[in-house]
Amino acid sequence: LIGHVDHGKSSYADSLLAANGIISSRAAGQVRYMDSREDEQERGITMKSSAVSLTFKLRKIQEGQVEGIDDYTLNLIDTPGHVDFSSEVSTAARLCDGALVIIDVVEGVCTQTVHVLRQAWMDGLRTVLVVNKMDRLITELRLTPNEAHHRLLQLIEQVNAVIGGFYAAACM
């Protein structure tokens, strides 16, 4: 999990842990399970990368019928978002095949977002964009459905522009 500070990486990790039965779904987003150090819990930020292995079952469906179930193991690394701990992100990225890029829908692409996207690009990681904190569009910004849709499109365009810049620089 990579992204800017306070975009919800640790809370998202909690949700994945809850889906695996490691913590209760009610505690997800509050317990910050991956922030196991006392100073991380006190400050409310991740300072060291933490890893956990999760298992997921995926049903194979062929022509509407379940053909079987595949088991997958996902090694999840929750990384810090603060610039002071960017070496933790670099180290974690070198251990991974892919990355979930967590972006707060209201904050959008921030400086550390660009940095972690660049790190993922340089390390050849397959990235998946996770748009987080969707409730803020309604509770804080009070957007209509059409305005929220437009905001999401803008965010995706921002991310694509950043990655497109990396591609253009690599081609020169």
For the regions a protein language model found, what residue spans apply to each?
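P-loop NTPase switch module centered on the Walker A-proximal segment
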Residues: 1-102, 141-144, 150, 154-163
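Detector for methionine-enriched segments
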Residues: 30-34, 47, 122, 134, ...
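Short helix-terminating capping/connector loops at secondary-structure junctions
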Residues: 68-69, 170-172
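Conserved C-terminal guanine-recognition region of P-loop GTPase G domains, centered on the G4
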Residues: 93, 98-171
